[in-house]
Every structure is written in structure tokens, then in C-alpha cells.
Design a protein with these regions (language model features):
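Negatively charged, low-complexity tracts enriched in Asp/Glu with abundant Ser/Thr
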Residues: 1-24
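Generic short amphipathic/hydrophobic targeting helices enriched at N-termini
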Residues: 5-6, 10, 29, 74, ...
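N-terminal compositionally biased, intrinsically disordered segments and leader/signal-like regions
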Residues: 12-13, 56, 76
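Acidic, low-complexity, intrinsically disordered interaction modules
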Residues: 20-73
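Mixed-charge, Lys/Arg-enriched low-complexity segments
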Residues: 59-94
């Protein structure tokens, strides 16, 4: 798999994460500068009331993309209990 194919796989997984966590995972529109595509992903951190940002670039090698993706998923695992609590509160309001 070449690096652009790998980038497509990583970004498609991120879009699935966004759809599963309404408003808690934000994805900035993909940008391209000098042939390098980049995608910024923000994970909501309730404790700090802000987003932790991760940037994925098509110029990264597979190892860098994989490491960044694993770090992001690890952060999501830590945040999941808080996200579940937020989601329950949202459902109760409706």
C-alpha cells in the first residue's frame, strides 16, 4: 500500500469516528498546500472544555500516520467514559 492509499484508509476511519460521536470529534475540511493534503481532527476533552488537535498529512510515512492514529485512538479510549456521560445528558434533554 502506498502512502496516499494509507492516508485514505486513516482518514476514512476518522470520518467514521466523527459520525459515531456527535460533536465530540470535529474534523476540519481537508486542505492541500503544495501537493500535501492535511486533515485536522479535534477530540473534545471535557475536563479542559476544549479540543485536543491531531493533524494528519499525506506527506507523513506509514509509521508516522499509524503512530498518530494510535495516539488519537488512545486518547479517545481515555475520553470515552466522559463522552458517554455527555451523550446521556444530551439524550435526557430531548
Amino acid at each position: 500500500m502506498n502512502i496516499l492509499d494509507y492516508y485514505e484508509v486513516v482518514t476514512s476511519k476518522i470520518f467514521k469516528l466523527e459520525s459515531m460521536n456527535e460533536g465530540l470529534v470535529l474534523i476540519a475540511p481537508e486542505q492541500e498546500v503544495d501537493g500535501v493534503r492535511s486533515l485536522m481532527v479535534g477530540l473534545y476533552v471535557p475536563e479542559h472544555e476544549r479540543y485536543k488537535m491531531y493533524t494528519f498529512r499525506s506527506s507523513m510515512n506509514e509509521g508516522e500516520l499509524g503512530d498518530k492514529y494510535k495516539a488519537m485512538v488512545g486518547t479517545m479510549d481515555v475520553l470515552k467514559p466522559d463522552w458517554d456521560r455527555i451523550s446521556k445528558k444530551r439524550r435526557k434533554r430531548v
